C-alpha cells in the first residue's frame, strides 16, 4: 500500500496517533464487539442456561451448574484468548484505513 505524504491529507486526519494505534474509545469498541461476537458464538450455551434458570427458579444454582459451567467455559474461551480481541482490533484498524483511503481519493479527485 502506497503512503500518501500530502500535508493536507495528514492535517485532515484527526488523530495524532499512528493509524494502527487504537484510541481508548476504539479499544472499548473492540471489546464491546468481542463481547457481542462471543455471545453469538456461545448462543446455544447461553440459551441452555437461560432455559434451565427459567425452569428451576430459585433452585437455579445447584440444578443448573452443568449449563452454567458450559456457558462460562465457552464465553471465557473467546474472551480470554488474545487472538479474538486482536481480530476485533484489526477490524477497527481496517475501517480506519478504508476511511483514510476514501479521504485521500476524495482529496485527489478535487485537485
UniProtKB/Swiss-Prot annotation:
Family matches, as Pfam families: Cmc1
Intracellular or extracellular location(s): Mitochondrion inner membrane; Mitochondrion intermembrane space
InterPro entries referenced in this protein's UniProt entry, alphabetically: Cyt_c_biogenesis_Cmc1-like
Chain span(s) of sequence motif Cx9C motif 2: 64-74
Something else known: Present with 259 molecules/cell in log phase SD medium.
Domain remark in the UniProt entry: The twin Cx9C motifs are involved in the recognition by the mitochondrial MIA40-ERV1 disulfide relay system and the subsequent transfer of disulfide bonds by dithiol/disulfide exchange reactions to the newly imported protein.
Protein family membership: Belongs to the CMC family.
Biological role: Required for mitochondrial cytochrome c oxidase (COX) assembly and respiration. Binds copper. May be involved in copper trafficking and distribution to mitochondrial COX and SOD1.
Protein name (database record): COX assembly mitochondrial protein
Gene name of the record: CMC1
Amino acid at each position: 500500500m502506497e503512503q500518501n505524504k500530502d500535508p493536507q491529507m495528514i492535517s485532515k486526519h484527526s488523530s495524532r496517533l499512528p493509524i494502527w494505534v487504537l484510541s481508548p474509545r476504539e479499544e472499548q469498541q473492540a471489546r464491546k464487539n468481542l463481547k457481542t461476537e462471543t455471545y453469538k458464538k456461545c448462543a446455544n450455551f447461553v440459551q441452555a442456561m437461560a432455559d434451565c434458570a427459567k425452569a428451576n427458579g430459585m433452585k437455579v444454582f445447584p440444578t443448573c451448574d452443568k449449563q452454567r459451567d458450559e456457558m462460562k467455559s465457552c464465553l471465557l474461551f473467546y474472551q480470554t484468548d488474545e487472538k479474538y480481541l486482536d481480530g476485533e482490533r484489526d477490524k477497527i484498524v481496517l475501517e480506519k484505513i478504508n476511511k483514510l483511503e476514501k479521504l485521500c481519493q476524495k482529496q485527489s479527485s478535487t485537485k
